[in-house]
Amino acid sequence: MHTALRSILIVTKSGHREAEALGERMRAWLAARGLSARVVENTGDAVSLAVAGQECSLALVLGGDGTILGVARRLLGSGVPLLGVNLGKVGFLAEVAATRWESSLERLLSGGVTVQERLALSFRVERDGATVHSGGAVNDVVINRGILARVINLDLRVGSERLGELRADGLIVSTPTGATGYSVSARGPLVHPQLHVYTVTPICPFLNNLLPLVLPGEARLSVTVRDRTNEVYLTQDGQEGYALQAGDVVHVERAPGGMLFATIEELSYYRKLKAKGFIKDQA
């Protein structure tokens, strides 16, 4: 879908002078063309970011994939589309190269913003019948062992159907956006970002008793921690963690509203896979 540009929020990587300077140049460039823009630093404060984004029609995020992920997670359900400007290394989530930002913004102004809705995840941790922790994820929700090199025991259920027990280093529940992250390193599948599905991939499963699964977006996954001797943690997008206890049940499902990404279609998904080394042409 397309949306008209009214005002723009520019979010810069925390403590990054290059990002701050570029943000100010962008603000001045947009102001010269009649658009209001505000520059804020990504401090990790979800409330202040949500307030800043209330009046904007687009959020430009200046940084690497980590910065883009953090901002995207805090904008879940806000209805504000996000466009990443790559100042990092991999830059798979970024649509715009920092060296070509002016031409990219010119395309935005001339054609409006094309918005793509992507599936995101919500989760909650149930302990003794009560919810003790909850949140959202743009890339993945991971349940993994602590510092000791021991497998952990998890019990998996999809809806009312029990899949069985998994003994592994952990489990990755990934969105299509996160399929090129931790999930693919654990032999999870590449998934087109426009598909409304999510994947379940074990990390080093003992005896390989569970292969990666692709679940419909409407499916609800429940993971019960059976381990009583090892440390077990839940992490969201590799950035925020929570210690789990034996008997905890982690419920994962599709987040309402999903995540909105703006696109200017400079590079197709398949060309991006090739450019980042996920597909290698042998010809």
From Swiss-Prot:
Its cofactor is a divalent metal cation. One of its GO terms (molecular function) is ATP binding. Its main location: cytoplasm. The keyword Hydrolase does not apply. Its EC number is 2.7.1.23. NAD(+) binds at residues 65-66, 139-140, 150, 167, 169, 180-185, 239. InterPro entries: ATP-NAD_kinase_N, ATP-NAD_kinase_PpnK-typ_C, NAD/diacylglycerol_kinase_sf, NADK. This is NAD kinase. It comes from Nitratidesulfovibrio vulgaris (strain DSM 19637 / Miyazaki F) (Desulfovibrio vulgaris). The gene is nadK.
